[in-house]
Regions:
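Glycine-/small-residue-rich active-site loops that bind phosphorylated ligands and cofactors
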Residues: 8-9, 35, 60, 85
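Short, well-ordered alpha-helix to beta-strand connector turns
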Residues: 50-51
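A structural preference for short, hydrophobic beta-strand core positions in alpha/beta folds
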Residues: 29-31, 78-79
Length: 116
């Protein structure tokens, strides 16, 4: 599975990949640093070789996925979103990836984890 990120998600995605490997799940990371100019051809080349893609975003609306799709036409296989104002922790991503690989949906952090 390829985890796609942008902005502040870089480090937590890398930590998550290490934990996924410990759980027997092979994952890699494609991270976008520059939005303008967006290198759509290079992005398509990389994304088209991925077996399964999940985008990790710290927002409600899936802002980067919409931008990626508008620039490349590429639609990711899954989404992990967190929008409670707190950053992702690796277990959020690991649990969501595991759930999506089982066929479930994991769009955001469960409500009970938001209320502290």
């Amino acid at each position: 599975v390829t985890l796609i990120g942008w902005g502040s998600t870089a480090d937590v995605i890398q930590e998550s990949i290490e934990q996924l490997a410990e759980a027997g799940i092979v994952a890699n990371h494609l991270h976008f640093k520059w939005m303008v100019p967006f290198h759509a051809d290079e992005a398509i080349d990389l994304l088209s070789s991925c077996k399964r893609t999940i985008i990790v975003e710290n927002n409600y609306s899936g802002l980067f996925h919409r931008y990626l799709r508008s620039e490349t036409g590429f639609t990711v296989d899954g989404h992990i979103r967190k929008y409670d104002g707190e950053p992702f922790k690796p277990h959020h991503i690991v649990n969501a990836v595991q759930e999506q690989l089982k066929g479930g949906e994991a769009l955001s952090v469960p409500y009970e984890e938001i209320i502290v």
